[in-house]
Swiss-Prot record:
Pfam family for this entry, one: CC_BshC
Keywords, alphabetical: Coiled coil, Ligase
Enzyme Commission numbers on file: 6.-.-.-
Name of the protein in question: Putative cysteine ligase BshC
One term of GO molecular function: ligase activity
InterPro entries recorded: Bacillithiol_biosynth_BshC, CC_BshC, Rossmann-like_BshC
HAMAP family per UniProt: BshC (MF_01867)
Domain of life of the source: Bacteria
Organism of derivation: Chlorobium luteolum (strain DSM 273 / BCRC 81028 / 2530) (Pelodictyon luteolum)
Length: 563
């Protein structure tokens, strides 16, 4: 296996590439300094901030016993085993911190970056334990199942043939605006699963992958239950703790945040708008638009209702005519916190209020919108944790590596290293394609053939005076020879062009195959492909390999991993 690291600032090829804010966050220089100084509280490159964060968390009060009891119950339900039980128990101590990550639930674990996030949290927690052995750091994966947008999580894709095949289960048991996590699969999940397995080619690992999927995805299981069980089965030895946020026990611990949101509404929205103005001053766009109240209400069917705030002391629930005073809404929060759900603005605040979050492992998009929340953290009286970029990979199969070698040859860049060819492809794929095709079409040969014709004609013309003196009848023979030589050169040229076109078609087909593998549907591979495609070919040991790569490299570079 070969590994190459690419700077995020050089990756310009995918049409849905990495945001400018994220590229600056992972780079060096004054732009990063301004961004960190004005939009975040902590810098993971400053040693002093680590000690500061340890002190801040040690001085705060958390409901640790309640948190541990809830997590133990949840992880037993998901099949977490003794490894997770021991890890959860550590949280009872005030010297235990959490390294948190999270992800929207996805079909069959969703896109590759779900796995990368989980492993990144495990690795970062291990690093902190090595740096601060007197403390414990536990990796926690937040199961984002309260979202009501079903279409995105209920989807996954794998390579099949020369392209991609997409999978979406049908469901007849889902209500509009129902939370994704509580959605139960009906019989159609079996059809989706078998169709998915049929697209996996025969291999030594296919049965293992099929067994894991069938044990997790079956009629009657919830979306959250299936996702959680599969994630744990893929990482049986990792101390990853799963957290379900719509557990009533969790909502009771988060009730203080809900109360302050209602008490001060629309203050949190004003905070986000003000912080977004700071971002715009720095040259970045805002990713998130806050609402007057950044909470949803859950009705008896588990459907999320927007909370509207039409006047200073009135609140309404979407779809209902009843009005609530601020006092009545606060009573509802106090009596039934399980009926409330944070939106994207409030979710990080809830997370870092309930958990002793030392660091949050975030994707590129998350880092962009977390930059809008600094003032809101201050509004709720807590400090933002370290925001650490997750690991980012492009997995390259052997057949694609061979195509990269071919591109090295045909583009006339044999002196390039393997890293340089990847850097060239990731920075300007279209330019590389054009260069390769031009070379394959032998456009540079046209002047060579013309030069050959002219040299032959000049050589024969030099014979003419001498031949005419010897025997004038030789002159017509010379003319015929010139025509014959022209025809020979033309014939060679035509055959060369035909051979070039064949090579051109073959090369173009190979380049398109590589493009599909590296940038499926024009975006980063990790945002679309499902891990099962690779596990079927290379076994579940691949997850251990990915962890080793994260242990050996910084997550502030994109990792090209040749399998």
């Amino acid at each position: 296996m070969n590994t190459f690291l690419l700077d995020y600032n050089t990756i310009l090829t995918p049409k849905k590439g990495f945001p400018k804010l994220f590229r600056d966050y992972t780079s060096e220089g004054s732009q990063r300094d301004s961004l960190l100084g004005r939009c975040f509280h902590l810098d993971d490159r400053k040693e002093a901030d680590y000690y500061r964060q340890l002190g801040l968390l040690a001085s705060r009060r958390f409901q640790r016993d309640s948190l541990v009891d809830m997590l133990q119950t949840q992880n037993r339900r998901f099949g977490g085993g003794e490894v997770r039980e021991r890890e959860i128990e550590k949280l009872r101590s005030p010297r235990c911190m959490a390294v948190v990550t999270g992800q929207q639930l996805g079909l069959f674990t969703g896109p590759l970056y779900t796995i990368y996030k989980a492993l990144s949290a495990v690795v970062f927690a291990e690093r902190q334990k090595a740096l601060f052995p007197e403390y414990d750091f536990v990796p926690v994966f937040w199961l984002e199942g309260e979202d009501h947008d079903y279409d995105e999580p209920a989807h996954t894709a794998i390579f099949s043939g020369s392209g991609l095949t997409h999978f979406r289960p049908e469901t007849n048991r889902r209500l509009p605006d129902q939370m994704v996590g509580s959605t139960c699969f009906d019989a159609s999940i079996q059809n989706t699963l078998e169709a998915f397995l049929d697209m996996l080619p025969p291999s030594d690992y296919r049965e293992e992958v099929a067994t894991i999927l069938r044990e997790c995805y079956f009629p009657g299981n919830t979306f959250e239950g299936a996702f959680a069980s599969m994630l744990l089965r893929l990482m049986p030895k990792e101390p990853l703790i799963l957290l379900s946020s719509f557990d009533p026990a969790f909502k009771r611990m988060a009730a203080g945040v809900f109360t302050r949101e209602i008490e001060t509404a629309p203050a949190s929205s004003y905070n986000v708008v003000a912080q977004s103005s700071t971002l715009e001053e720095l040259g970045y766009g805002a990713q998130t638009k806050p609402r007057a109240v950044n909470l949803f209400h859950l009705n008896q069917h588990g459907q999320r209702q927007k909370i509207e705030h039409p006047s200073p002391d009135l609140f309404t629930l979407a779809g209902e005519s009843r009005q609530y005073s601020r006092h009545q809404m606060l009573e509802l929060v106090s009596d039934h916190p399980e009926r409330f759900s944070p939106n994207v603005v409030l979710r990080p605040i809830v997370q870092d209020t309930v958990l002793p979050t030392f660091a949050y492992v975030a994707g590129p998009g998350e880092i962009s919108y977390l930059a809008q929340y600094r003032r809101n953290y201050e509004h709720f009286g807590i400090t933002m944790p370290f925001i650490v970029p997750r690991g980012s990979f492009t997995l390259v199969e052997p057949k694609i590596s061979r195509i990269m070698d071919r591109m090295l040859q045909v583009t006339g860049r044999p002196g390039f290293s393997r890293k340089q060819i990847y850097a060239a492809v990731f920075s300007d794929l279209e330019g590389m394609k054009k260069k390769a095709v031009e070379t394959a079409e032998n456009r540079s040969l046209e002047p060579l053939f013309q030069e050959a014709r002219e040299e032959i004609q000049r050589a024969l013309d030099r014979l003419l005076p001498t031949l005419s003196k010897i025997d004038p009848t030789l002159e017509p023979m010379l003319g015929a020879s010139k025509a014959q030589a022209e025809k020979i050169v033309e014939n060679i040229e035509q055959k060369t062009w035909k051979a070039g076109r064949r090579k051109h078609e073959e090369l173009l087909e190979q380049i398109l195959k590589a493009e599909t593998a590296l940038f499926p549907e024009g975006g980063p591979q990790e945002r679309l492909l499902n891990i099962c495609y690779f596990l079927n070919k290379y076994g579940t040991g691949l997850i251990g390999t990915l962890k080793e790569q994260l242990q050996g490299h910084s997550s502030e570079s994109h990792i090209i991993l040749e399998l």
